[in-house]
């Protein structure tokens, strides 16, 4: 499996791009091909889908886009083409908010997504996807510019706590000064356990 391709985009078509990596051209299906700069060296994050008859690369400008694509693939009834179409037609913040807020009508606007598929997306992904910049925005709103605290909050989210739970801790933890990341994590876990 490939994580990314680092090469020159030599061809841009309506459904795909071609990335030249050391003389080998990789055809990569992407959501928005014209967002890639032609004849420029770029890193394209990829997912390789292998089936009985085919091997296909799906590409993304950012690792977060790839992660959201992979989450969509986990939904029963959503294949790579549908997931790519969803990513092509939306800003990720709106999509993630719709998933986390049970907004079926918002999800039905995507190609080939009916009420059942929309409900399945919500059922399978609610609480499992986060707004890409929500964590960064959360920390920017903090009253301190404390790197150890920021890292601790990110770690708590990585441990599986929701954005809302962690956001509630920010003020309490920011009142504690001169602490290491580990100490903030420990304090955060204690506060989360208290409920």
Swiss-Prot record:
InterPro entries: DNA_helicase_Holl-junc_RuvA_I, Hlx-hairpin-Hlx_DNA-bd_motif, NA-bd_OB-fold, RuvA, RuvA_2-like, RuvA_C, RuvA_C_sf
Compartments where found: Cytoplasm
Alphabetical list of Pfam families matching this protein: HHH_5, RuvA_C, RuvA_N
Main location: cytoplasm
Domain of life assignment: Bacteria
Record GO cellular component, one term: Holliday junction helicase complex
Region (Domain III) residue spans: 144-195
Annotated region described as Flexible linker, given as residue ranges: 139-143
GO biological process: DNA recombination; DNA repair
Location of region: Domain I: 1-61
Region: Domain II, residue numbers: 62-139
Function of the molecule: The RuvA-RuvB-RuvC complex processes Holliday junction (HJ) DNA during genetic recombination and DNA repair, while the RuvA-RuvB complex plays an important role in the rescue of blocked DNA replication forks via replication fork reversal (RFR). RuvA specifically binds to HJ cruciform DNA, conferring on it an open structure. The RuvB hexamer acts as an ATP-dependent pump, pulling dsDNA into and through the RuvAB complex. HJ branch migration allows RuvC to scan DNA until it finds its consensus sequence, where it cleaves and resolves the cruciform DNA.
HAMAP family: DNA_HJ_migration_RuvA
Family per similarity comment: Belongs to the RuvA family.
NCBIfam families linked: ruvA
Subunit record text: Homotetramer. Forms an RuvA(8)-RuvB(12)-Holliday junction (HJ) complex. HJ DNA is sandwiched between 2 RuvA tetramers; dsDNA enters through RuvA and exits via RuvB. An RuvB hexamer assembles on each DNA strand where it exits the tetramer. Each RuvB hexamer is contacted by two RuvA subunits (via domain III) on 2 adjacent RuvB subunits; this complex drives branch migration. In the full resolvosome a probable DNA-RuvA(4)-RuvB(12)-RuvC(2) complex forms which resolves the HJ.
Domain notes: Has three domains with a flexible linker between the domains II and III and assumes an 'L' shape. Domain III is highly mobile and contacts RuvB.
Name under which the protein is recorded: Holliday junction branch migration complex subunit RuvA
Organism: Pediococcus pentosaceus (strain ATCC 25745 / CCUG 21536 / LMG 10740 / 183-1w)
Gene from which the chain derives: ruvA
